[in-house]
Curated annotation (Swiss-Prot):
Membrane topology according to the record: Single-pass type II membrane protein
Protein source organism: Homo sapiens (Human)
GO BP, sorted A to Z: blastocyst hatching; carbohydrate biosynthetic process; ganglioside biosynthetic process; glycolipid biosynthetic process; glycoprotein metabolic process; N-glycan processing; oligosaccharide metabolic process; protein glycosylation
Binding residues annotated for substrate, in chain numbering: N214, N236, P237, S238, S322, T323, G324
Cell compartments where the protein resides: Golgi apparatus membrane
Name of protein: Alpha-2,8-sialyltransferase 8F
Protein task: Alpha-2,8-sialyltransferase that prefers O-glycans to N-glycans or glycolipids as acceptor substrates. The minimal acceptor substrate is the NeuAc-alpha-2,3(6)-Gal sequence at the non-reducing end of their carbohydrate groups.
Keywords annotated in UniProt: Disulfide bond, Glycoprotein, Glycosyltransferase, Golgi apparatus, Lipid metabolism, Membrane, Signal-anchor, Transferase, Transmembrane, Transmembrane helix
Record-linked CDD domains: GT29_ST8SIA6
């Protein structure tokens, strides 16, 4: 073979190999790509492509979290709670009578909403109360706000007056006796049967100031649920008449029972009805004669009238405010933080468990005298707005 022929044969062989190579590669590429994908899936354990990003060896591997999901749930809950707040306002303004189950459903919904104190809401509401009523100066009768010679009108029997003579004037403190005002943490303890087995006693007793209503029991087994500390307790004059025989033959029993309240203030509505005056004064003189540690105070009738007008504008139109709402209103003015316990005007819990009216008995109030569900809807609004906090169920025990 000629030298030129050998060179041509070599070139022809190379061209043939190149042609075969080109024909073979396109047919194999899809198969190879499938292998790479399967290998990639194994390496990433099925992670979606959207979460697989190119990165240098120094870049940290990103972690898939549920923070977005949690944020969405939080926004949904916030929106739900806002709607619930508006719903309660509308609910309380309705003239239609709502059933106990309606209220319990609302309370169930409220319990799913996280509570947070709202300083601005609290300040605004407190300012409105101070403007209309001014508990700091006018909550109780004092020598400063009721001088000798005043003709004081009764709260309910407003056409009747009592002249303030020296013998009455000397029963009054010189000024408001709440020297440590404003108190940081206050507990207003109602008497609802919801307190039974609540284990709230320790938490209540840690408060700076504890308000109670109508001489409730605080010793023995109940103390673990209701606490034992008392700074101020109201007394309904009917208790003095019915339970203590108007402090005649049962004076000793009265003095024995009140010893459990330490140096608390006893608050009586001496100037609400004329029938209350003599009984309230009898309590004052009994404590003076026995040199008891407690001091007697009297609700100022004008304060109570102004307070009733304030709540009337919000739909509470009953014959008279309950003691619980009166004291709650006082606490908002005297305290920075207010928590309510034992406020439960219903016959059962949200779990449908029967509840006694009081934690110590099941005696119901006079029909129509107070407007408990209407008042309670107002308190629910204060809770939802972060002005005060309602304890609905058992307390957390450390």
């Amino acid at each position: 073979m000629r030298p030129g022929g050998a060179l041509l044969a070599l070139l022809a062989s190379l061209l043939l190999l190149l042609l075969l190579r080109l024909l073979w590669c396109p047919a194999d590429a899809p198969g190879r790509a499938r292998i790479l994908v399967e290998e990639s899936r194994e390496a990433t354990h099925g992670t979606p492509a959207a979460l697989r990003t190119l990165r240098s060896p120094a870049t940290a591997v990103p972690r898939a979290t549920n923070s977005t999901y949690l944020n969405e749930k939080s926004l949904q809950l916030t929106e739900k709670c806002k709607n619930l707040q508006y719903g309660i306002e509308s609910f309380s303004n309705k003239t239609k009578g709502y059933s106990e189950n309606d209220y319990l459903q609302i309370i169930t919904d409220i319990q799913s909403c996280p509570w947070k104190r709202q300083a601005e809401e609290y300040a605004n509401f407190r300012a409105k109360l101070a403007s209309c009523c001014d508990a700091v100066q006018n909550f109780v009768v004092s020598q400063n706000n009721t001088p000798v010679g005043t003709n004081m009108s009764y709260e309910v029997e407003s056409k009747k007056e009592i002249p303030i003579k020296k013998n009455i004037f000397h029963m009054f403190p010189v000024s408001q006796p709440f020297v440590d005002y404003p108190y940081n943490q206050c507990a207003v303890v109602g008497n609802g049967g919801i307190l039974n087995k609540s284990l709230c006693g320790t938490e209540i007793d840690k408060s700076d100031f504890v308000f109670r209503c109508n001489l409730p029991p605080t010793t023995g087994d109940v103390s673990k649920d209701v606490g034992s500390k008392t700074n101020l307790v109201t007394i309904n004059p009917s208790i003095i008449t019915l339970k203590y025989g108007n402090l005649k033959e049962k004076k000793a029993l009265f003095l024995e029972d009140i010893a459990t309240y330490g140096d608390a203030f006893f608050l009586l509505p001496a100037f609400s009805f004329r029938a209350n005056t003599g009984t309230s004064f009898k309590v004052y003189y009994t404590l003076e004669e026995s040199k008891a540690r407690q001091k007697v105070l009297f609700f100022h009738p004008k304060y109570l009238k102004d307070l009733a007008l304030f709540w009337r504008t919000k739909g509470v139109t009953a014959y008279r405010l309950s003691t619980g709402l009166m004291i709650t209103s006082v606490a908002v003015e005297l305290c920075k933080n207010v928590k309510l316990y034992g406020f439960w005007p219903f016959s059962k819990t949200v779990e449908d468990i029967p509840v006694s009216h009081h934690y110590y008995d099941n005696k119901l109030p006079k029909h129509g005298f107070h407007q408990m569900p209407k008042e309670y809807s107002q308190i629910l609004q204060l809770h939802m707005k972060g002005i005060l906090k309602l304890q609905f169920s058992k307390c957390e025990v450390a």
